[in-house]
Amino acid sequence: GATYAELCRNFKWEIPQYYNIGVDVCDKWADDKTRLALIYVDSDEIEQRYTFRVLRDRSNQLANGLNANAIKRGDRVGILLSQRPETLISHIAIYKLGAIAVQLLTLFGPDAIEFRLQDSAARAVVTDKENLSKIFEIQKRLPHLNLIIVVEAGQQEGVLDFWNCVEKGSCAFTPVKTKPDDAAVIIYTSGTTGQPKGTLHGHRLLPGILPGFEFYHNLFPREGDLMWTPLDWAYIGGSYDALFPTLYHGYPVLAYRPRKFDPEKAFYMMAKYRVKNLMIVPTALRMMMHAVRRPRERYDLHLRSITAGGETLGEALSDWTREQLGVEINEQYGQTECDLVVGFCSEIMNTVPGAIGKAVPGHIVEIIDKDGRVVKGGDLGEIAIKSPDPVMFLEYWQNPQATKDKFTGEWLRTGDYGRKDENGHFWFGGRQDDIIESGGFRIGPGEVEACLMKHRAVALVGVIGVPDPVRGEIVKAFILPKAGVTPDKALEESIKEHVKKRLEAHAYPREVTFVSE
């Protein structure tokens, strides 16, 4: 039962001289031929189970297949697949080959895919027949792309069938000896301006992410742990915040991702497969809260840990999770370039409503000013992480200027505003580029949203700044009222008053728009 202070004090990074993600999430567990790695449930609820042994053999076969098609160390390979076994097998094979995986979201349209495959100069892409038409549409503009591997390709011209490619390969493959700083994966991140940037991570990303993962999941692993996330594995939140750290520890993951998130189905699946660990975004959890107020009366749930990130939780959601799911939700904070660095571990510390947590042991996180000096005394500044840090990205792919701009001295700037209180808790103030400057005041939309979520009539909220001739900008709130609440002038006044009282007089929304969905 170590305390937070002890965990921080005793923490030491120990990353070996040679390190490969593919070996560490798969091969090291494959000697036990019965050890379960993945339960895959497709949209028709047909289930397949994969052991670590089978994943090792299939990924070795695919690595040989890629090799036979001239894919070598350092080549970029796009993965345009959702949560399914072939996605995982592709990742592991690419890493063992010393190539670089490029994570692509199946929700992307052709333009978004084209930019990413063009920018990364990907030599190959692995996809399914559903997304193949997008690749065909852009293929002639992608001179580097000379290999298309398709799950269930059928008799399609000009492509390789995934499982044919696997079956032709030998189960024997010697993984390339990679170092922790050797490139492993590119994850594109959208900026507020211009095109997305390719965040290039080394193999050290996985060891770098483990302290945060173990922290948020209440000292993972425990006997019987089983992970599920409704997030697509093409997001860092799906792959590196859930899938890979679980497999690193030799525990199983449920792969299930229907086209449309269905809150009742989510409860059903978690009960059926005895999910212990959940990684989710607050919006999805809110949908679950609104759909099933008392889930434990309807479902036999076994949850041990829930972590959420990507947006502010709000007190109502935390309270409901505690009361109705019997689990204290652990907020997590990070970004694609430097993930899982702040959060809570309810096992060893009290969660604080509204705060995003403390620095995860192993990471040095502070609030800095524009010159890179640490800000004291709870003042507003930018959340920053001190380098070097294993979880930190190597660079933006072929964009040295953007990489340079991300740092001030030894500090990686997140672009997020926040405060750090005297107890070491961080409070999120909003994105730097979302900050609303109104009448000389700097207002973080995140804080206003969190405050509005505490209003008895509010189900969902979004806050932006809109131009104003007098104040420069004013706060505007879009509000989805709770079921049965009729939006009227009185409610609008009550909402404004609530923020004036609960947050700050100048931060209230001067414009309120009620929405129906």
What are these regions (language model features)?
Residues 248-251, 275-280, 289-351, 364:
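Gly/Ser/Thr-rich phosphate-binding loop
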Residues 59-61, 167, 199-220, 285-289:
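Conserved structural elements of the adenylate-forming
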Residues 359-362, 373-405, 443:
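Conserved ATP/PPi-binding loop(s) of AMP-dependent carboxylate-activating enzymes
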Residues 207-229, 233-277, 290-291:
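Conserved AMP-binding/adenylation subdomain of ANL enzymes
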Residues 68, 89-92, 96-164, 178, ...:
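Structural core segment of the AMP-binding/adenylate-forming
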Residues 151, 501-517:
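AMP-binding/adenylate-forming catalytic domain of the ANL superfamily
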Residues 34-36, 150-156, 167-188, 195, ...:
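Conserved pre-ATP/AMP-binding loop-to-beta segment of ANL
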Residues 108-115, 123-129, 278, 387-389, ...:
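AMP-binding/adenylate-forming catalytic core of the ANL superfamily
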